[in-house]
Amino acid sequence: MFLLSFVLEDWALHELLPLKPQRATALLLVASSYVTWTFQMHTFSNSLETIIVLWCLVLMGRMRDDREHTQVKLCMALAFLGVLGIFNRITFPVFLLVPGIRLLPDLVAKPFRLLVVLLAGSLTVLMAVATDTEYYTGSRLNFSTLFQDCILTPYNNMMYNMDSANLAQHGSHPFWQHFIANLPQLLGPAIPLLLSSSRKNILFWSGISGIAVLSCFNHQEARFLLPAVPLLLASIRLPDSSKLRQTWLGMWILFNLLAATIFGLYHQAGVLPVQDWIRQHEANNPQHVFWWKTYSPPRWLLGQANAQITTTDLMGMSGPQMMDRLSDSISCEQGTAHEVLLVAPGSATFLDEFTSTADSEASGLSFDLAFSHRQHIGLDDLDFGDDGFEPTIQRVFGRRGLDVWRVSKICPASG
């Protein structure tokens, strides 16, 4: 992702911004943004989505610049990237709404372009569906039964995300989360410039319209906005005053150094060490491990222990639901498992009433701390709406760490 981001992202911005001063500013801001150093370096689907969005904009721009020719290769490339983007993330098209509407008259004016896009897109969809079907069914592809047994991952993804109960498992957020909390978290001091002096060009509206559509969903994570970051940074004008420009650049550097430290060294940093601890200490002990309010744990890191250990990702499930899942998984019957592991951030204050000795019996479960990794902060757990700004910051940063709890059921003494 490092090479893909720095080469393809910069190349795309070079084409999207023909004026040298604008291009130089955009490349400087994107390259110096902590988002590029941290989030964009991960193998997130959001990172790939960012690159695909930029290159779709490049191809759309090339097609608009040459309206005389059909440009078959460009149409095929655009169709391929469009399908790839949708199969990568179902939300991908929201960042292309404005440029797509803008391109539509050019496609209608040259119907053969539209025909090429549809044919190339259909072929790419067929290949993607065939690949997914073979991967998820685990059997050889049989074209005679492909349309009966096919796996349509974008459709399944869309159906899953349209169910509010499913999104609630990942955590619910207010509709303003993206604009008021997530975007300032990603752009910092660039927000005032974005509001006051940005160029309201196609890049700006692509980013803003995408964020607006994503705000309609009640599960909103900052990483969902990665494609908007280079689009909005490329729209910014630096202050004309030399003194103001130097002051702003100083704030920009400090913000990104601080954010890079937090997101590069602390944000969800305990997931891998804790998973490695589980591999070392529970490899010979058949165990059920529940992960709560963390990134999805990489099961491959368990190695051979993966056969002995059952991993369940509870995502952002509510506290009471999480307790019910724990209780249901432990039995007092002889010959059954009497213990499970719970991995949860130290900032999860919901657990306090159950992990204290005095109150543990009320829940019917006993919690014993087995391991704790201090270098961990879960910034996906910023609940400003319910807790307020200062209490949330104190909770997330003051109680940093990722804990492993041995959870057992308090069973009545057999007589």
What role is predicted for each listed range?
Residues V58-I86, I90-V125, A234:
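Perimembrane helix-loop-helix junctions
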